[in-house]
Amino acid sequence: MKKIIFAFIILFVFLLPMIIFYQPWVNALPSTPRHASPEQLEKTVRYLTQTVHPRSADNIDNLNRSAEYIKEVFVSSGARVTSQDVPITGGPYKNIVADYGPADGPLIIIGAHYDSASSYENDQLTYTPGADDNASGVAGLLELARLLHQQVPKTGVQLVAYASEEPPFFRSDEMGSAVHAASLERPVKLMIALEMIGYYDSAPGSQNYPYPAMSWLYPDRGDFIAVVGRIQDINAVRQVKAALLSSQDLSVYSMNTPGFIPGIDFSDHLNYWQHDIPAIMITDTAFYRNKQYHLPGDTADRLNYQKMAQVVDGVITLLYNSK
């Protein structure tokens, strides 16, 4: 009997972290009849990566053209639209904020940064088109705007396009999301960062992880979308995962881990944690899958717009089901 009890204790010790970390049992929400347009997603990505390329910190004119494009889409969706200054030398840098639903009460915030990275390669400055990082997230944000125009949400929803996430601003007070998070006056139920949602690869071995042992729980093919949060964000992650699972052809995996795990805080959601706001990231896992991360090869033709649309469908399902 003691051996049986000991075996159960060992099993519990191993299973409990796995259940918290991996969340294998989540029921899908009913899907919404309204759907994102893969064609419109591609149109937005191509505009951001070709017409206003590069969108890096040293190309302020292209950043401002991107901001105007985003603002026009938000306005046409019937939102209450404002511009928020991000105080950075050499600006103006602007967050574009769109509000839907009730003008007071708690909010759900969906955010994506519209800037792209630059880097030195062989002592020469190079620019990425930033299709996956992060024109894909912005395209998702603008499709959400179009869908929210068709049906006003019952809860307050705020869509935010951030001006500055990439280096040299990352992890600084000059991140657009840091400025936005510090300015909030309404209570926030949930913040979601759309960070690289467009690249998928079904080849064996195409998916990597911060630690090799994670491959015991997660696929080796990069054909899924991930929902990522801290341990204390477990309810938020479950809620978002359930909504994404409403897209039946979309493979969804989730992860709740301590903040020190590499990759867990690699986007704008990290700035909301400082204000005790539940905040999670929806991502294709960035450089753990996409080998053109921050490189010139991050182009529009490499993205899967059907899967991107399924991700947006999941997020709009969440918003329509929130009260």
Swiss-Prot record:
<dbReference type="GO" id="GO:0016020">
    <property type="term" value="C:membrane"/>
</dbReference>
<keyword id="KW-0472">Membrane</keyword>
<feature type="transmembrane region" description="Helical">
    <location>
        <begin position="4"/>
        <end position="24"/>
    </location>
</feature>
<dbReference type="InterPro" id="IPR007484">
    <property type="entry name" value="Peptidase_M28"/>
</dbReference>
<protein>
    <recommendedName>
        <fullName>Uncharacterized protein YfbL</fullName>
    </recommendedName>
</protein>
<keyword id="KW-1133">Transmembrane helix</keyword>
<dbReference type="InterPro" id="IPR045175">
    <property type="entry name" value="M28_fam"/>
</dbReference>
<dbReference type="GO" id="GO:0006508">
    <property type="term" value="P:proteolysis"/>
</dbReference>
<keyword id="KW-0812">Transmembrane</keyword>
<dbReference type="Pfam" id="PF04389">
    <property type="entry name" value="Peptidase_M28"/>
</dbReference>
<dbReference type="GO" id="GO:0008235">
    <property type="term" value="F:metalloexopeptidase activity"/>
</dbReference>
